[in-house]
C-alpha cells in the first residue's frame, strides 16, 4: 500500500505499510477519494505509559494522527494527555477530545457519520453518483436522492449542519 489518507473515528492519518501494520488498520469503505478505516485499539490508563512506549507512539490532536517523530507534531499545541490507547504494535496518545477531521491539510468542521445522516443534507458532495469517478455538488437534494444514497453507502462525512460528502457507489441501475 502506498501512502494514502485514511479517515478513522480518531482522526485522519497519512499511512504507509509500516503505519498500517503498527495501528492494525482495517479498511471499511470509500467515500470518493477518501478511505474510511478503523483502528483496532483498547483504552489504557495514561499512568501505564512507559518510556519505551514513547519511542514508537502516535499522537492524536485536532483530527490528525501523527507518529511521534513527525514534523507535524511541532505544530500541535499539546497541553495535556486526555486518554491513551494500545494498538497492535504501539500506543496512541489523544491530546484532546476533538473529533473534527483534518482532511488533506485543510482543517474543516467535518465528522464521520453513518450514511443515514444524509437525510439532514441541504448540500451534498456526491462521488460516483451516475458513473464511476464522477463528482456532483447538489444543492437542496430531493428526498428520493437522499434515500437512494443512504441505501448505497455505509458512511458519510458531515459538518453536522447540512453539508454532506457521500459516495453514490454507482452501478448501472442507480437513479433509474
Swiss-Prot record:
Secretion signal, residue range per the UniProt entry: none
Keyword match Amino-acid biosynthesis: no
Induction: Expressed in the early phase of the viral replicative cycle.
Statement: the UniProt record of this protein carries the keyword Calcium: no
Localization in the cell: Host endosome
Gene Ontology CC entries for this record: host cell endosome
Entry keywords, A to Z: Host endosome, Host-virus interaction, Inhibition of host adaptive immune response by virus, Inhibition of host MHC class II molecule presentation by virus, Viral immunoevasion
InterPro entries linked to this entry: Chordopox_A35R (IPR009247)
Example of a GO biological process term: symbiont-mediated suppression of host antigen processing and presentation of peptide antigen via MHC class II
Record function comment: Mildly affects the expression of MHC class II molecules on the surface of host antigen presenting cells (APCs).
Family designation: Belongs to the orthopoxvirus OPG163 family.
Descriptive protein name: Protein OPG163
Organism: Monkeypox virus
Amino acid at each position: 500500500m502506498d501512502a494514502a489518507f485514511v479517515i478513522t473515528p480518531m482522526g485522519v492519518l497519512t499511512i504507509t505499510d509500516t503505519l498500517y501494520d503498527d495501528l492494525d488498520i482495517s479498511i471499511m469503505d470509500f467515500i470518493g477519494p477518501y478511505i474510511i478505516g478503523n483502528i483496532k485499539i483498547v483504552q489504557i490508563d495514561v499512568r501505564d505509559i512507559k518510556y519505551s512506549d514513547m519511542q514508537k507512539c502516535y499522537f492524536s490532536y485536532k483530527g490528525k494522527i501523527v507518529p511521534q517523530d513527525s514534523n507535524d507534531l511541532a505544530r500541535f499545541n499539546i497541553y495535556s494527555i486526555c486518554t491513551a490507547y494500545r494498538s497492535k504494535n504501539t500506543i496512541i496518545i489523544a491530546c484532546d477530545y476533538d473529533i473534527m477531521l483534518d482532511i488533506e491539510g485543510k482543517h474543516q468542521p467535518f465528522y464521520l457519520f453513518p450514511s443515514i445522516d444524509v437525510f439532514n443534507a441541504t448540500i451534498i458532495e456526491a462521488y460516483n453518483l451516475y458513473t464511476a469517478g464522477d463528482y456532483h455538488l447538489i444543492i437542496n437534494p430531493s428526498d428520493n436522492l437522499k434515500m437512494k444514497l443512504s441505501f448505497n453507502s455505509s458512511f458519510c462525512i458531515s459538518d453536522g449542519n447540512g453539508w454532506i460528502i457521500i459516495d453514490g457507489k454507482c452501478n448501472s441501475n442507480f437513479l433509474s
